[in-house]
Regions:
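Rhodanese-like catalytic fold shared by cysteine-dependent sulfurtransferases
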Residues: 1-21, 28-60, 70-107
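Short, surface-exposed ligand- or partner-binding patches at beta-edge/loop junctions that are enriched
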Residues: 64-65
Length: 107
């Protein structure tokens, strides 16, 4: 499974020469109310098995959760379903807040 650090993702998102990946946030709705990375799409982990057909298998997808554990599980699931361009955000939104956006609310 590929991983990307929050700092690497921020750099990638700021590069207009690169196509933006889908930011798939698999946290629960109550977590999204606290904080989220701008532009992310919500799909709680428990709904992924029923909804993964909504995702583009050919689009690079960065999967996000609180610390990186749930997103790693979703990455592995998506890879088993034939998705080859999934990347886990190492450290999740907690890492994003620590490395990229210190103003982001944490929990």
């Amino acid at each position: 499974m590929r991983q990307i650090s929050p700092a690497q993702l921020a750099q990638r998102l700021s590069d207009p020469q690169q196509p933006a990946p889908l930011l798939l946030d698999v946290r629960e709705p109550w977590e999204l109310e606290i904080c989220r990375i701008e532009g992310s799409v919500a799909m709680p982990m428990g709904s992924v098995p029923a909804r993964f057909s909504e995702l583009d298998r050919n689009r690079e997808t960065v999967v996000i959760c609180h610390h990186g554990g749930r997103s790693a599980q979703v990455c592995m699931f998506l890879e088993r379903q034939g998705f080859s361009r999934v990347i886990n955000l190492a450290g999740g939104v907690a890492g994003w807040a620590a490395q990229v956006d210190p103003r982001m609310a944490q929990y």
